[in-house]
Amino acid sequence: MAKVVGIDLGTTNSCVAVMEGGKPTVIANAEGFRTTPSVVAFAKNQDRLVGQIAKRQAVMNPENTFYSVKRFIGRRPDEVTNELTEVAYKVDTSGNAVKLDSSNAGKQFAPEEISAQVLRKLAEDASKYLGETVTQAVITVPAYFNDSQRQATKDAGKIAGLEVLRIINEPTAAALAYGLDKKSNERILVFDLGGGTFDVSVLEVGDGVFEVLATSGDTHLGGDDFDKKIVDFLAGEFQKNEGIDLRKDKQALQRLTEAAEKAKIELSSATQTEINLPFITATQDGPKHLDLTLTRAKFEELASDLIDRCRIPVEQAIKDAKLALSEIDEIVLVGGSTRIPAVQAIVKQMTGKEPNQSVNPDEVVAIGAAIQGGVLAGEVKDILLLDVTPLSLGVETLGGVMTKLIPRNTTIPTKKSETFSTAADGQTNVEIHVLQGEREMASDNKSLGTFRLDGIPPAPRGVPQIEVIFDIDANGILNVTAKDKGSGKEQSISITGASTLSDNEVDRMVKDAEANAAADKERRERIDLKNQADTLVYQSEKQLSELGDKISADEKSKVEGFIQELKDALAAEDYDKIKSIIEQLQQALYAAGSSVYQQASAEASANAQAGPSSSSSSSSGDDDVIDAEFSESK
């Protein structure tokens, strides 16, 4: 079988590896480096440059040099507002999709197209190394990437001419590389702080089994954000001294960005660094130069809020894994940004353990992807990888409630189904609104897409049985199917190009869910109460109609009175009154029902007949039907 390579498609740098002789090997690129900058540029002659050569010319060609593209992939225009100010190239958000504008190429590119150029270079370099054409790959993504971002990454692979056999999470890949030869069971925490994203995963590793217990993250926290802190500091100091904002000059901004990255790297080993940028700009008085000293202490002060943000996903992952930090055996650092001393210090402070630095943080993810590639190719035996989905998935039901089908941190691949019904008599279609998030209300979660199931035979509400099936594959990509059990009509949607989560929304969902738990619970209880009251009104009117003259006029009048009171309370949204009248109406119905049975029993005795004379017909479906309904799509 052909070789399957493992690719870490990073925000700042990318890496490719392959299994050779049962061991993973990192493949150096054509320039001799083991990592490749995730940078693509278009020169004036329209030549396409990829990797180190593209990065080197960025200062002279800032508007046609594309970097940190991973922050745009799989996202909608309204979700990249913050990113627009952090790059020197033009990002077009006027249409339905994000486009990257290149004046030299004379066209616009989708982020997937730019990422595909990086993937293509890695595949070509691997092909030269192996002496055979590479056509299959395992590509890694941040654990907190959503469905659209995962699919967009897969599409980038396809554009690059690769068959993407699997999309796997970066911290999981790192755990594979770390734990390949581990025989004894260990609980490990992977702390993955890369160029653009931050992931934390808790895994149980040992004897070939890699089980993810929980994952958390922040999709807008990485090395780029640390660089921006330095850029803003340098630009602020220069503006204070010279009255000029360098951030408005794209060429100067590119020079500042490169200087900031270099300073950040130097401060990992030195306590201070000199930043010299001669001829950074010019005025009528002549050229201006930037010359500053940046200490590690000042850098840590500038980035203190970013470092503090590292705490939340760690705490969330530990909580979701139902473990204490003392139960974690090893802390594995992944991603170049974990070289920052302050980051290592906060990890040690939180966990009370020295982080394990036995793996190369720049290469370990690609190595893990190569191991997974070896598993899929049959080269690596006796490895079982059990990953999870990072966010809950569900559908919107009556009252705007999110009904969860798959809770977050569920092992994938997985398939779950639930049966729902209609909300109105004669309803012939339902709209399935697929959601992702942790809040109780649909409007507070992220919409992944909607689709409609038509052709439901007209029937009283609550009678049709509509089975909704959620199927997440090993790539973490979701497919949803809705099927009417009566007619056999079926409709499905693959959540691929749907609306996706913005950079702040994913982690905000979990935080908001906890912060707003009480309010969410109250709103959910109110909607449940309204649904209960609606159903009771419907059933009561139906029962009165069926009983006819079997109950006395007084009993009938009493029930009708409570029904009207309940309708009035519903209209006024008086929840205390709704609760009170529900109880009174139920008691009145019980009394009416009892009198019917007593009357029937008396008649039976008079006729000397034994046995029941009536039977209950209250069952309306099988036990799997959830007490939640769809509103009819107009």
From Swiss-Prot:
<feature type="modified residue" description="Phosphothreonine; by autocatalysis">
    <location>
        <position position="197"/>
    </location>
</feature>
<dbReference type="InterPro" id="IPR029047">
    <property type="entry name" value="HSP70_peptide-bd_sf"/>
</dbReference>
<dbReference type="InterPro" id="IPR043129">
    <property type="entry name" value="ATPase_NBD"/>
</dbReference>
<protein>
    <recommendedName>
        <fullName>Chaperone protein dnaK2</fullName>
    </recommendedName>
</protein>
<dbReference type="InterPro" id="IPR013126">
    <property type="entry name" value="Hsp_70_fam"/>
</dbReference>
<dbReference type="GO" id="GO:0140662">
    <property type="term" value="F:ATP-dependent protein folding chaperone"/>
</dbReference>
<dbReference type="InterPro" id="IPR018181">
    <property type="entry name" value="Heat_shock_70_CS"/>
</dbReference>
<keyword id="KW-0143">Chaperone</keyword>
<dbReference type="InterPro" id="IPR012725">
    <property type="entry name" value="Chaperone_DnaK"/>
</dbReference>
<keyword id="KW-0067">ATP-binding</keyword>
<dbReference type="GO" id="GO:0051082">
    <property type="term" value="F:unfolded protein binding"/>
</dbReference>
<dbReference type="GO" id="GO:0005524">
    <property type="term" value="F:ATP binding"/>
</dbReference>
<comment type="function">
    <text>Acts as a chaperone.</text>
</comment>
<feature type="compositionally biased region" description="Low complexity">
    <location>
        <begin position="601"/>
        <end position="620"/>
    </location>
</feature>
<keyword id="KW-0547">Nucleotide-binding</keyword>
<keyword id="KW-0346">Stress response</keyword>
<dbReference type="InterPro" id="IPR029048">
    <property type="entry name" value="HSP70_C_sf"/>
</dbReference>
<keyword id="KW-0597">Phosphoprotein</keyword>
<comment type="similarity">
    <text>Belongs to the heat shock protein 70 family.</text>
</comment>
<feature type="region of interest" description="Disordered">
    <location>
        <begin position="601"/>
        <end position="634"/>
    </location>
</feature>
<dbReference type="Pfam" id="PF00012">
    <property type="entry name" value="HSP70"/>
</dbReference>
<feature type="compositionally biased region" description="Acidic residues">
    <location>
        <begin position="621"/>
        <end position="634"/>
    </location>
</feature>
